[in-house]
Swiss-Prot record:
Covalent S-S links between cysteines: none
Coiled coil (UniProt feature): none
Endpoints of the signal sequence: none
UniProt xrefs under InterPro entries: Bit61/PRR5
Record-given protein name: Uncharacterized protein C6B12.03c
Source organism (scientific name): Schizosaccharomyces pombe (strain 972 / ATCC 24843)
GO biological processes: TORC2 signaling
Length: 302
């Protein structure tokens, strides 16, 4: 064999059978056919598209990034898991309850009622990392062993959002109900809602590439089934049902209209226009919404 051919074999530029004993340094089987480096790279890329549940739990988190060319979600990338989560998993096995508790604790800084100190109020965004929250949501899905576990997980998610959103105004010092609604709405819509949508991205946008992360067909089916969940619409409904309506029921109909600046007026109109998109569940809610609309119209045209 010529020296040039030997170099081609070493660089992987040809495909022939090699009988040389030194070939064992590169392959275990002397009769195995060598392949090009380009083909091996392609095969590795194909294998990375599907990641098992075990690798998600043990190796790291996954997060989606927008593609520059097509503007869609690109293939999800893995992130290294924090030492804190690794230590917890070593102490006790991962279950749906344990995974949900970890996610619930990690989401607390998003809501103002869980920011106890001045430092928490100023630096709460530094404690909230969307990639870690996405990873914790995937851990919850990995811990599910049946469709009943997955449905229970979705139920816990709804209950948790209802509790946290309904307590948004507990620290408000505004005496006027319109000032109160404007203040709470600005916090909810501008700060909290984007984080809620980004956190539960693996559940709400499974139709893109999230479902490909699971090798088990059933878990892929669960995620595709949950793709109809509109967490933004659900969160807005919770805000209207448990924040706006209780405040309106306690307000005197003949109350004097307070003064609002331009920014507050914009927020008030925005809130009413958005929460009015959801159909009232009963007649009392319909009456309260009509009264709020009339009051706002009078206020704007005074």
């Amino acid at each position: 064999m010529k020296l040039r051919d030997k170099w081609k074999i070493y660089l992987g530029l040809t495909t022939i059978k090699v009988q040389c004993p030194c070939f064992f340094l590169f392959h275990n089987d002397e009769n195995r056919t060598t392949t090009s480096n380009l083909d091996s790279v392609k095969s590795k890329k194909k294998r990375r598209k599907t990641i098992s549940d075990a690798s998600i739990v043990s190796n790291g988190s996954l997060v989606s990034h927008p593609s520059i060319d097509k503007g869609k979600l690109s293939i999800l990338k893995r992130y290294k898991m924090s030492h804190r989560l690794t230590a917890i998993d070593k102490l006790r096995p991962l279950t749906v309850l344990v995974a949900w508790k970890q996610l619930n604790i990690a989401m607390r800084p998003i809501f103002p009622q869980h920011r106890y100190t001045e430092q928490d109020k100023k630096n709460w965004k530094k404690k909230v990392i969307i990639e870690d929250l996405n990873f914790l949501v995937l851990r919850c899905i990995c811990a599910c062993e049946a469709i009943s576990d997955f449905e229970e997980l979705l139920g816990n998610m709804r209950i948790g959002l209802i509790i946290d959103i309904s307590l948004l105004g507990m620290n408000s010092n505004e005496s006027s109900f319109l000032h109160y609604l404007v203040e709470v709405w600005s916090i909810f819509y501008l700060e909290i809602l984007p984080y809620i949508e980004a956190t539960f991205l693996p559940v709400t946008f499974a139709k893109f590439e999230i479902a490909q992360l699971f090798e088990e067909p059933m878990k892929t089916y669960w995620l595709k089934k949950s793709a109809n969940i509109d967490l933004k619409l659900f969160s807005i409904w919770v805000f209207r049902k448990f924040v706006v309506m209780p405040k309106l029921k306690k307000t005197n109909r003949f109350i004097e209209i307070p003064q609002l600046n331009t920014q507050q007026q914009i927020l008030l109109v925005q809130m009413i226009s958005i929460i009015s998109l959801i159909k009232p569940q009963d007649e009392s809610e319909d009456l309260l919404m009509n009264w709020l609309n009339e009051l706002t119209l009078k206020f704007l045209y005074v």
